[in-house]
Amino acid sequence: MKKFDSHTYLYIAAAGIVLILALVVIYMLTPVSKADVTQYVYIDDDDTQDSVIAKVGAIGHTAGMTGLTTLIRHSNYGERIRTGRYAIEPNEGAFVVFRHLKQGRQTSMMLTIPEVRTMDRLAGVLGRKLMLDSATIATALYDQEACQKLGYDTCTIAALFVPNSYDIYWNISLDKLLLRMQREHDRFWKGDREQKAAQMQLTPNEVCTLASIIDEETANNAEKPMIAGMYLNRLHEPMPLQADPTIKFALKQFELKRIYNKLLDVNSPYNTYRNEGLPPGPIKIASIKGIDAVLNYVRHDYLYMCAKEDFSGTHNFARTYQEHLKNAARYSKALNERNIK
């Protein structure tokens, strides 16, 4: 039987070490993701090391996942799992991905604030986009004390939100989110907008309230300054705004196509047929176009408007009630002809 000398054993051992190191390098450097585009993994506050492995594994390459699984299981990663939205690039190996997860090197995201009608709807959107629970968000937005800390009440809180897109972290806390929105609101209004509102003797909240009504009246941005001028004329008369969108909001029946006289008696501070002045707060998150339409309103002497009978989304304006009745009759006739109830 052939005997191996000590040098042979050293060669075998060295070869074994080289093989092991080669495997380590392969497993650590082989891309984790099997996709050829950036993938995102969302680590929640109830995740464990096993669930993290499962989440990454859903988009992972077998060899790359072997290395990542080894690193996660044989380290103290499970003792402090960092929440967040993590980008996994196509060429990133197990060691790089593990380091990002371990150190909490998450990737920010663009959050767009939608122009929704209710805070329930906003909470739902934010709950789907962020780590936050929608019920928790809604509770805060309907809590008087929480709103007052930000300088609002439950009627005006919609004015806090400027419908822009913001670079934000997926795992942001609710308090930090609201404070961020407050900073963005102040930045949006500071300067020219704030000065114009003051010259009009309106607060930013009041501008947002009127803008929200105008947004609901038309999607035609070019016409919004005209509508703003008409409503401002009514406020200065003073006359009730008589804005149909406020009736829909009061009834929470946003799908209504026609506002009949029987609906005008709804007992609500948002009923601008029964109450003079602006309603208590915005009836939706006002658009930037709507806000700027109020601040740059067209000066004219119109007091009435009615949707055009051609259903173009624009309006006929009138100076007198008699002229307005003629416009309203034409529009009502067009509705009847189309059997719109």
Regions found by a protein language model. Give the residues of each.
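Bacterial extracytoplasmic/cell-wall-associated proteins, especially those involved in peptidoglycan
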Residues: 112, 124, 131-135, 146-341
